[in-house]
UniProtKB/Swiss-Prot annotation:
Cofactor: Fe(2+)
Co-factor remark: Binds 1 Fe(2+) ion per subunit.
Cellular compartments per GO CC: cytoplasm
Binding locations of substrate: 134-138, 167, 180, 184, 279
Keywords, ordered alphabetically: Acyltransferase, Cytoplasm, Iron, Metal-binding, Transferase, tRNA processing
Family: Belongs to the KAE1 / TsaD family.
Protein name: tRNA N6-adenosine threonylcarbamoyltransferase
E.C. number: 2.3.1.234
GO biological process: tRNA threonylcarbamoyladenosine modification
Binding, Fe cation: 111, 115, 307
């Protein structure tokens, strides 16, 4: 039985959690959404300062919630890549300090590997191989999960990530930040077939389309042109219908690629991770399509779809059980491929 305290500060959530194997003992998430709303997005310098102000209290809360002493903690982990460099440094430095102070092993964890492991928090018996659909504000990828630390990217977005597209369309419609939840809410009362929008296929040099890669920039532009035309005609914007049509288009595009990828590679399980995994439209499309194709789809609990430290701790537990630890000199990286996860360990 391995107990890990993990810290996640890659973007705008200050999160600390303690996990025993795949059981969450405590999970603290201090969101900065209200801080960044006035700017319409995350401001890196503001995020770093907010992490500094919150991190010590979050660690204390996590320890209190778990009702554990430091003697019961086996290792300390923190997200080290990818993410905002200043934000990552706050969490990584705090984790290293705790590891040195309490003489514990230290592990750096890849943020996207954490999102893969979020599914394990509700499905502790899940075993590779399976297909991971990672959909967040910064990443949209189809990942072949072979085992802990071994990942192969099979498809990705060529431009905007799914979550980024939601934020940009919400900004275009003057709905505020973050865009995902508000578009999802509006879409509940809208007509998803009101407007035909492009799914964003990626052409191949020899003709045809890439089966697993996608693009959301064209979809975003199509919504912009739709809004401009409606305003030019003097029509009021049917926000619910636009939201529903946009959300359905994103969900259909992601679902088609995920299903095709799983079937082509003989994988019977699709595990979805990242903030967009909370989207009701995506969940409905994937559940229907997987059932029709005799596949299984798994989602993390809603509270573990967005950034959290429990998923980071869960990944660290698996690495530690394999004898993996990180050097205390490990730094942060704004970009790091999932295929390079093992460079974090010694």
């Amino acid at each position: 039985m391995t107990t890990v305290l993990a810290i996640e500060t890659s973007c705008d959530e200050t999160a600390v959690a303690i996990v025993n194997n795949r059981q969450v003992l405590s999970s603290i998430i201090a969101s900065q959404i209200s801080v960044h709303q006035q700017y319409g997005g995350v401001v890196p310098e503001v995020a770093s300062r907010a992490h500094l102000e919150t991190i010590n209290g979050a660690i204390a809360q996590a320890m209190d919630q778990a009702q554990l002493g430091w003697d019961k903690i086996d290792a300390i982990a923190a997200t080290c890549a990818p993410g905002l460099v200043g934000a990552l440094l706050v969490g990584l430095t705090a984790a290293k300090t705790l590891a040195i102070l309490h003489n514990k092993p230290f592990l750096g964890v890849h943020h996207l590997e954490g999102h893969i492991y979020a599914t394990y928090l509700s499905e502790p018996t899940l075993d590779p191989p399976f297909l991971s659909l990672l959909v967040s504000g910064g990443h949209t990828s189809l990942i072949y999960v072979k085992e802990c630390g071994r990942y192969e990217s099979l498809g990705e977005t060529r431009d905007d990530a799914a979550g980024e597209a939601f934020d940009k369309v919400a900004r275009l419609l003057k709905l505020g930040y973050p865009g995902g939840p508000v578009i999802d809410k509006l879409a509940q009362t809208g007509n998803p077939q009101a407007f035909a929008l492009p799914e964003g296929k990626v052409s191949l040099p020899g003709g045809g389309y890439h089966p697993y890669d996608g693009s959301f920039s064209g979809l975003k532009t199509a919504v912009l042109r739709l809004v401009q035309q409606l305003e030019k005609d003097g029509d009021s914007l049917p926000l619910e219908d636009i939201a529903a049509s946009f959300q359905a288009t994103v969900a259909k595009a992601l679902t088609k690629r995920a299903i095709a990828c799983a079937l082509d590679y003989g994988l019977d399980t699709i595990a979805v991770g990242g903030g967009v995994a909370a989207n009701s439209g995506l969940r409905q499309h994937l559940q229907a399509a997987t059932a029709a194709n005799n596949l299984r789809v798994l989602f993390p609990p809603l509270k573990f779809c967005t950034d959290n430290a429990a998923m980071i701790a869960c990944a660290a537990v698996d690495h530690l059980s394999r004898g993996h630890t990180s050097p205390i000199t490990l730094g942060v990286e704004s970009r790091l491929s999932l295929s390079q996860v093992m460079k974090l360990y010694q």
